[in-house]
């Protein structure tokens, strides 16, 4: 095979398994700039309501209207005066401070302060702990 002259091919190179660019690749900034330089037509379209879930938030206006129309008083029950006095009296008989009582029932001293000032929302679990620690009936009929 002693050839004469340079070796040349008479066919075009074929690339196997090269995929066409997908939509994401066409939106790439580099691709768009290349298309602008070559003078190709570029269409830019903004999606309507993209990224803002308007469909989900539009239903809240009905609920807001219902809440505005509702006149009922929405508040939690607080500790009744009799219970406040009973806790203070039982604690006084046992000669315990608020922090000592709180330590006995594994609660924070602030919880006892809230119960004795009437700001707490009654919790049956805490009330039963108080009854056991103080040895007095705080709930129900005496």
Swiss-Prot record:
HTH cro/C1-type domain location: 87-141
Amino acid composition bias (Basic and acidic residues), ranges on this chain: 65-75
GO cellular component: cytoplasm; cytosol; nucleolus; nucleus
CDD domains, per database record: HTH_XRE (cd00093)
Stretch forming the signal peptide: none
Expression sites by tissue: Expressed in leaves, roots, stems, petioles and shoots. Higher expression in flowers and siliques. Detected in leaf veins through development.
Ranges annotated as biased composition (Polar residues): 50-64
Induction comment: Not induced by heat or cold treatments, H(2)O(2), dehydration, high salt, abscisic acid, 2,4-D, ACC, methyl jasmonate or salicylic acid.
Domain of life where this protein originates: Eukaryota
DNA-binding region: 98-117
Pfam family, one: MBF1
Coiled-coil region list: none
Keywords: Activator, DNA-binding, Nucleus, Transcription, Transcription regulation
Molecular function as annotated in GO: DNA binding; mRNA binding; transcription coactivator activity
SUPFAM superfamilies linked to this entry: lambda repressor-like DNA-binding domains
Disordered, as annotated region: 49-75
InterPro entries xref list: Cro/C1-type_HTH, Lambda_DNA-bd_dom_sf, MBF1_N
Gene3D superfamilies in UniProt: lambda repressor-like DNA-binding domains (1.10.260.40)
GO annotation, biological process: positive regulation of DNA-templated transcription
Primary role: Transcriptional coactivator that stimulates transcriptional activity by bridging regulatory proteins and TBP, thereby recruiting TBP to promoters occupied by DNA-binding regulators.
PANTHER family associated with the record: ENDOTHELIAL DIFFERENTIATION-RELATED FACTOR 1 MULTIPROTEIN BRIDGING FACTOR 1, MULTIPROTEIN-BRIDGING FACTOR 1B
Stated name of the protein: Multiprotein-bridging factor 1b
UniProt lineage: Eukaryota, Viridiplantae, Streptophyta, Embryophyta, Tracheophyta
Gene from which the chain derives: MBF1B
């Amino acid at each position: 095979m002693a050839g004469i002259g340079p070796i040349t091919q008479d066919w075009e190179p074929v690339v196997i398994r090269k995929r066409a660019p997908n939509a994401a690749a066409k939106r790439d900034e580099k691709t768009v700039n290349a298309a602008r330089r070559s003078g190709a037509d570029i269409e830019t379209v903004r999606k309507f309501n993209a990224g803002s879930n308007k469909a989900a938030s539009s239903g809240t206006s009905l609920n807001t209207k219902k809440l505005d129309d509702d006149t009922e008083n929405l508040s939690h029950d607080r500790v009744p005066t009799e219970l406040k006095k009973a806790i203070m009296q039982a604690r006084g008989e046992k000669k315990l401070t608020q922090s000592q009582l709180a330590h006995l029932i594994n609660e924070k001293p602030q919880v006892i302060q809230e119960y004795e000032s009437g700001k707490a929302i009654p919790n049956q679990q805490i009330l039963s702990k108080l009854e056991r620690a103080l040895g007095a009936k705080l709930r129900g009929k005496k």
